[in-house]
C-alpha cells in the first residue's frame, strides 16, 4: 500500500546512505536541541502524520520546514512552511532555501511565528478563552431557559 511503497528502495538507501545523510536511530531527548541547532532545515516527506512533535521542536529553534503537502498541515501550520508532493518539488524547495538567503530568512521567520503561536503561554490563553466562552454561552443558555 501507500505507506509501504518504496520500502525496499529506502532500506537499501539506509544501508548505504549518501555521504551527507546520517541515520541516527533513537536519539535521547536531551540531545535533540543540539541536533536541531545543527540543522539547516527540517524535511518531513511523510504521507501520513498526526501532530508531529518534531515540527514543534524544529520551529522552536526557527528551523525552516519542508513538508509534504498534507491537509493536516494546512490546518495547523497555516502555510508557514514550504511544501511539495514529489521528489522534484522537494528538491526545488530545498534548493530555494539553500540558494536564496531571503527565502531562507522568510521561512526561519515563519518557523518563529509558529513557535510563538504554539508557545505554552499562547496555547494556555487559547484554552482559557475557549473555556470562558463555553462557560458564558452555557450561562446565557440557562438564563434564557429561566425566562
Question: What feature does the model see in each segment?
Answer:
Residues 10-27:
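Nucleotide-activated donor-binding/catalytic signature segment of Leloir-type glycosyltransferases, i.e.
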Residues 34-39:
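Short alpha-helical donor nucleotide-sugar binding micro-motif in glycosyltransferases
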Residues 47:
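Aromatic "clamp/platform" in nucleotide-sugar-dependent glycosyltransferases that forms part
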Residues 64-67:
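Short hydrophobic beta-strand element within catalytic cores of glycosyltransferases
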Residues 78-88, 96-101:
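Conserved acidic donor-binding segment of nucleotide-sugar-dependent glycosyltransferases
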Amino acid at each position: 500500500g501507500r505507506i509501504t511503497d518504496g520500502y525496499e528502495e529506502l532500506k537499501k538507501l539506509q544501508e548505504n546512505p549518501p555521504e551527507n545523510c546520517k541515520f541516527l536511530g533513537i536519539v535521547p531527548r536531551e540531545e535533540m536541541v543540539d541536533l536541531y541547532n545543527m540543522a539547516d532545515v527540517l524535511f518531513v516527506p511523510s504521507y501520513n502524520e498526526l501532530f508531529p512533535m518534531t515540527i514543534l521542536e524544529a520551529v522552536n529553534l526557527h528551523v525552516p520546514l519542508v513538508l509534504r503537502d498534507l491537509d493536516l498541515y494546512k490546518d495547523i501550520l497555516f502555510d508557514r512552511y514550504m511544501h511539495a508532493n514529489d521528489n522534484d518539488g522537494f528538491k526545488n524547495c530545498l534548493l530555494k532555501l539553500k540558494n536564496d538567503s531571503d527565502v531562507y530568512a522568510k521561512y526561519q521567520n515563519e518557523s518563529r511565528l509558529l513557535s510563538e503561536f504554539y508557545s505554552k503561554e499562547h496555547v494556555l490563553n487559547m484554552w482559557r478563552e475557549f473555556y470562558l466562552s463555553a462557560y458564558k454561552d452555557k450561562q446565557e443558555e440557562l438564563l434564557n431557559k429561566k425566562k
